Amino acid sequence: MARENKFGSSGGAKETPAGKLMETIVEDVIKAKAMPFAQWQALSANPLVPLAISVSQGGQYPVTQVGVDAAHMLSQQSWKSLEALRQTIDREAFMKLSFQAIGDTLRDCQSRLPEVPDGQNEQDVVLGDDFYAALVDDYQARLQQLAASASPDVDRHIPCHLFHSDQAVPAFAVGPVRFLPRAEWLDSFVKDSEVRELIHQVEARELDMEELTARSTVAESGRRASHALDVLRTLRHYSWVATIRMEGHEHARSHFKASVVVGLAIDAIGLRFQVEDARRFTKAGRQHLFAEDRFATTLDGRILRGSSVQMPGIGGRPGALAAKMAGEQSFLDAAGCILQHYVDGRRSGHALHLVERWANALYWVGEARREASDFMAVVNYGCAADGLSGAAGKASDMTSFAETALKPEGETVPEGVLTVDVAVHKVYREGRNKLAHGEMSGLLEDLAEPRAIGEALLPALFDVVTPVLADLLQNEQNLLKLDEKRAYRLLEAKLAARKANA
C-alpha cells in the first residue's frame, strides 16, 4: 500500500467531505491512466511500492501521490468515525481493507454512471455530487463487508507460567480467561489424536524435534507432523495455557486484545500473592524475567564473574497452592466479573468508566510489580492510585477514596504506624508527582521505601474495591445510567457500608 505524504496533509484541519475525496481519487485515476507507464512508475519514490490502489481479485488502479493522499485521508476519516471497527480491527489492517474497498468501488462504479443522453459523447457527461455520494455509500458498504470477512471467531491461546506441576492446581477461570495445565489444554484443544500422539512422543522423549521436523517436510504425510511442530513451538517450555474466545476480531487485533486481557487476568491472580511470587507469573510476550552473566576485571587483572537467574512459576509444599487457589476463587470470580464487563464493553466501544479505570489501574499495578526500577514502579503505583480512585490527579480525592476503603472506623492508629493518608501522600505527591515532574532524582535513587508503601497500598485497595465493584455491576441496575462522579459516589458509599458491616 502506497504511503501518504504526511507533511503535505492538513493534519488537524476540518475533515474533507467524503464525496470530494472520492472525486479526487476518480479524477486522479483518470489522470494516471493517461500517463505512459514509465512516467507513472517514476512518480514513486520506492519502485517496490507503486502509487496504486489495489482490487480484491487482483490488479490495481494507478494513481499519483494526489490520489494516494486522498485515499489515505478517506481511510483515516472512516477510521475515526467507526468506533466499533476500531475495537475489532488493527489500524494497519483497517487501512489495507479501506484501500481495497476503494479499489473495489472503482472497479464496479460503471453501474453508477449516469446515462448518456442521445447525441452526446461520454466525455461530455458531467459527474455530479450524486455520483460521488453513491460511490461513498458503495465504499462504506464494501468496507463493512471486508471487515466482517476478516474478523472470525477464534479461541486465542497464550502460554503462561503459573504454578509448578507438583502443586496439582486444577484448571480455573478469571472471567473470560480460562487457565489450563498444559496436558489438559492439549487434550481439550488439539482435536486430532494423531497430532496429540506425536506431541506426547516428543514430550516423553521418544521422538526428538529434529525427527519431527524432518517428518513435517514429507509431502503426503507431513501435515500432522507440521501441526504438532506448530503446537510444540508455541507452547515451548510453558506449563500452563490461557485461553480466551475472541468473537468478530481481525487476527492482529484479536491477538493483541487477548494478550492484554490475559495479562490483566494474570495480574489479578498476582494480587493474591506476595510481590516476589507475583513477579514469577508470566506469559508469552512478557520479558521481565531474565538470566544474565556479570563480568568484571580488577585493576590488577583478576577476572570476576557472576550470574543471575530469575525462574518463572511458583511452587511450594506439594499441593499447598491448590488449596490456596481454592480459597482465592471468590476474589478471582469478582475480578473475572469486572474483566468480563471490560471485554464486553470493548467489543464495540468503551466499557463503563468504573470498569475502564479498574482495568487501567490493575495494569499499572502489574507493571509496577514487574518493574526492575524502583523509580518506574513508584510512578506506576501513583498512576494506579489515581486511576482506581477516579481522582483525576486530585490528591485529596485520592486520600478520601482510600480512607473510605481502608481506614478503620473509630480506631486510634498507634504512633509510628503508617496511616492511609500518609501512604497516599508518599506514593502520589512525594512519589509519582515529583518523579514525573522532574522535582526529584529518580533513576538511580533509593526509592525502596515508597515502592514498598505502594505495594502495600494498591493490593489492599484492590482487595476491598474489587468485590464491591463486581457486586455493583451485578446488582445495581441504574449504574450504567450514572455519570462518572455519581458512580464513584455510589461506589464510595458501598465501600463505607461494607466497612461498617465488617
Model-identified regions with their sequence ranges:
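Polyanionic, low-complexity intrinsically disordered segments
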Residues: 2-155, 413-431, 438-502
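Juxtamembrane/membrane-water interface recognition
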Residues: 25, 44-46, 55-58, 178, ...
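Charged, non-catalytic interaction/linker regions at domain boundaries
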Residues: 104-376, 383, 456-502
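Active-site-adjacent bridging/hinge elements
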Residues: 352-361, 402, 429-439
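Flexible secondary-structure boundary motifs
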Residues: 380-418
